[in-house]
Amino acid sequence: MNTFLIDYQRIRTPKKGFSKLFCDYSSESEARTKLLADCFHLDYRKDGDYYRHLGFLASRNFRREALVELLTEQNERFDGSERQQREIEKLRSPRCMAIVTGQQTGLFTGPLYTIYKALTAVVLARKQKELFPEYDFVPVFWIESEDHDFDEASSTVLFSGGGLEQITAEAAHRLPDQMAGATQLGASIGATVQEFLDLLPDTEFKPEIAEILESCYEPGVTFEIAFARTMNRLFREHPLILLSAQDTRFKQLAVEVLCREVETAPASSYDVVAQSSILESMGYPAQTKPRAVNLFYLNQLGQRLKIEQPSPDNFLIVPDRQRYTRHQLLEICQDHPEKFSPNVILRPIVQDAVLPTFAYIGGPGEISYLAQFRKAYEHFGLSMPFVIPRGSFTLVEPKIARTMDKVLKATGRPSFSRRQVYEAVFEDVQELRKSMVSGGDSQKLDALFEQVESEVTRSLSTLEPALVKMDPTLQAALSASSGQITKIIGTIKEKTYRAGRRKHDELLQQLDKAELNLFPDGKPQERSINIFHYLNKYGPSLIGELAKVLQGYSTEAHLIVEL
């Protein structure tokens, strides 16, 4: 596998993917230094912070036995392996820490970045064990099954026929705002699996993929269990602990945080607003807005309902219209914490209250909104863990790599390397196209046209004083003529590039296909395409190969991997 690194700051072609905050966070800049100092508790580049955080975790009293019992039962329910169980058992020791990541349930695991998050947690746990052999580090994947965005959870995307194909699964029965993970797969899931498999070409690996999906996705099984079982099958050789946070026993472990939110609301929201102001003063937009109560209420139908606070001592469940005093809602939370679900703000705090979280593996969006939560963590007496960027990949298939070779020749720049061609594609693919159609001389042509236009404009301007002196009305005629000449030059310029485009039309079409592969729907590949597209072609061992790549590289740059 050939591997190339690209700085996040240079990636501009995809419409979405890497925010300014994330680019600064992963850079070597003064902006990063200030961002870490003002918005986070720890810097993963500072050795002293590692020992400080290990000491903080060692001082806390985690309910490890109850946590192990919960994870053991879930491991059995998710068809986990003995190797995973051995990882779970390590958590009994106060010298075992967790490397945590997570994602909501996705159909057939969802976008590629779900796999990349899990892989990064696995690899980082190994690396930390090498650095601190007296401790154990286990990778934990938080399944965000309480999220009620069913449209996102029930669909996935594959390449198909030179385009993209979205596959969507139907629910057996679903109410508005119902937790996506708890929703059962409908009777048509078998047909959905077959539709997905039909989009995959026949390979030596396809029968194994079919067996995995057909056994994990069955009518009546919840989206969460199907997702978890599929993840366990893919990570058999790389033990990953899966955690379902919708479990009643997990909520009992988190009861102190849940109750404190009810007891002190809207205090944590004020903290988020204050931290967001700091962030905005640094030039970064706030990613999320807090509610008065950063909890949802789960009714008997599994619907995730908002909790509003119309007055300091009164709470309202919307849209059920149930009203509670603070004391009443607090009693419900103490007796039945399973009726409450943290929102995007409280979720990481609940996570780090229950788990001995050494580090959290986050994507660009997550790191951006975690920057708003420092003061909220302090409100609950917690320190933020290390926040480490997940591995970010673009997988380049052989056909696309060959196109890159042709593009390299077409640019007319013999000094260009393959890495520089990828940089050009990721930085500005339109500029690269322009370079190709002019045989590598686009900059010279641009300069020549600009020179001609400038000289004509300057020549005409020398006429202006004499013409105005003769007849002031001639100034308008001169101005109009200047505009027409500029327009004519622009037309000639466009025709020049069109002539070049015809000359290189075939290669440009290949570049269009490469762009679709690298940036499907204008987004980074990892944000849309499903992992099984690649596992079907290159085998399940691809996950191990990507783990090896991560083992040797930092996650502070984007990785381009030629398969």
Swiss-Prot record:
GO terms for molecular function: ligase activity. It holds the Pfam family Rossmann-like_BshC. Keywords: Coiled coil, Ligase. Its EC number is 6.-.-.-. It comes from the Bacteria. Residues 493-518 form a coiled coil. Transmembrane segments: none annotated. Belongs to the BshC family. HAMAP family: BshC (MF_01867). This is Putative cysteine ligase BshC. It comes from Chlorobaculum tepidum (strain ATCC 49652 / DSM 12025 / NBRC 103806 / TLS). The gene is bshC.
